[in-house]
Each structure stands twice: as C-alpha cells, then as structure tokens.
C-alpha cells in the first residue's frame, strides 16, 4: 500500500540521516568541520550523494554546510549523533559481553539495530551492563544526557623506543585488523612496551605480555594509548633482530 511505502521510505531516510550524523561526529566531533570526501569514504557512498544529503540535513537544521568548507553539526545534530552513538556502543557491549560475539560481528549487528531500539530497551541494556563508560573497543559511551568522557591519548605509532603505555582504544573500522589485534593482545587495558622503532617510518617492535611482535605502522595506526610515564632503555636494532630471529 502507498502508506506503507511512504513509511518505509521515511524510515530509511531517518536511518541514513543518523548514519551521517554519526559519521560526521566520529570524523570531526562537535567543534570541527568534516570534509565531504571523508564522509563519502567512511560511508562508502559517492561525493554527489553526500552533497545532496548534507543540503537536506542543513535545511532541517542538523548541520551547517558550506561547499568547500566542510560540514559541522549544529547543537541539535550533535544531540542526535550522540544518541545514535550511545545506542551503537551499548549494543556492541551487550553483544560481546552477553552473547559472546566477536568484535566485528558485534559492530555489524549494532550498525543495524542502533536505529530501532527504544529508549526503554536502551535503559535496560545499560543497566544490565552496569552502566559502562566505554565499549569493547575502548570508545567512550555517551551518557544519557549526552556527556562524553575524554582522556588524553596518543597514537601507538607516536611512541618512542623504550616507552611503556596502556592500550585504551582501538579502531572498529577494519575487521581483519580487529581480529589480528585481539589475537596478539592489542586490546583495551593491555600494557605494552615499544622496544624498537624502525628508521624512516619503519616498523615497530612491541612487547605484549612478554611476547615481542614486529608490526607495520599501517597495521597499528588505529591503536590509541595512554602513556604510563615509564621510560626504559630501548633495545638496540641488532640485538632486537637477533632475538626475533631466535624465536
């Protein structure tokens, strides 16, 4: 029936808008502008589709959009973005903690269901989980009032040789990376030490739970850490290579 088609179309548009709001906030927060190209890449859509949607969202008062200057969320847009992000991260936490889903599967399911759960179900999930502050990847879960906790973090790739740190956050954008990180123990809460930094943007030699791993920068650029303030003597390149060879 026409009415059902209209409702389905409206619902689909609402979901798309929530996806855009979430993408803009993730890329730029509520203080900076996100580029249309970055949004297109993140959502896997064309730049033309992004431009058309941003114009519609601007007319609805959700974003401030100027061509070639990017897009920023309005106060209303920020509130809606944080509500969607909260539902997504609560769902991910529930799926991993209570249904034993792996990170990627939980992320995919949350991408769909975040648009449909009621506020009452959201509250029940939050209560069941014990009101968590972060999701399985270490990303902060906005409070019901839209408050987001912040922590001074730096990319793992910025650490100098001999520096110890604690993993706080991992990107949820690449399934293969997530599986590999979890396999070697690069998960939120894990202490790590950078033993060696290769020259000219070379690979890193990191230590996790007593085991050493040579990792390329691209493979760990989605890892964010908090320094524990400890600085140990860096391992010399030749010695590190020799030890790695014995393993």
Outline where the language-model segments fall.
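Key DNA-contact positions within bacterial/archaeal DNA-binding proteins
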Residues: 48, 104
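Glycine- and charge-enriched low-complexity intrinsically disordered segments
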Residues: 203, 212-213, 217-247
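Mid-protein regulatory/catalytic core that forms ligand/cofactor-binding pockets
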Residues: 114-222
């Amino acid at each position: 029936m026409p009415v059902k088609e209209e409702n389905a179309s409206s619902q689909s548009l609402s979901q798309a808008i929530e996806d855009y709001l979430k993408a803009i906030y993730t890329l730029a927060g509520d203080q900076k502008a996100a580029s249309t190209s970055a949004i297109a890449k993140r959502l896997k859509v064309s730049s033309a589709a992004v431009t058309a949607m941003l114009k519609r969202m601007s007319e609805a008062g959700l974003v401030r959009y100027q061509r070639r200057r990017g897009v920023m969320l309005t106060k209303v847009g920020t509130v809606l973005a944080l509500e969607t992000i909260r539902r997504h991260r609560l769902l991910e936490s529930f799926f991993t903690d209570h249904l034993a889903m792996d990170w990627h599967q939980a992320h995919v399911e949350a991408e769909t269901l975040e648009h449909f759960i009621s506020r009452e179900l959201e509250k029940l999930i939050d209560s069941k989980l014990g009101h968590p502050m972060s999701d399985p990847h270490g990303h902060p879960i906005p409070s019901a009032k839209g408050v987001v906790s912040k922590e001074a973090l730096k990319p793992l790739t910025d650490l100098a040789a001999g520096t110890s740190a604690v993993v706080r956050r991992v990107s949820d954008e690449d399934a293969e990376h997530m599986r590999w990180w979890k396999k070697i123990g690069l998960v939120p809460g894990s202490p790590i030490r950078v033993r060696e930094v290769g020259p000219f943007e070379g690979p890193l030699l990191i230590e996790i739970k007593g085991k050493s791993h040579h990792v390329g920068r691209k493979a760990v650029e989605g890892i964010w850490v908090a320094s524990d303030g400890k600085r140990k003597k860096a391992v010399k390149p030749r010695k590190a290579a020799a030890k790695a060879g014995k393993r």
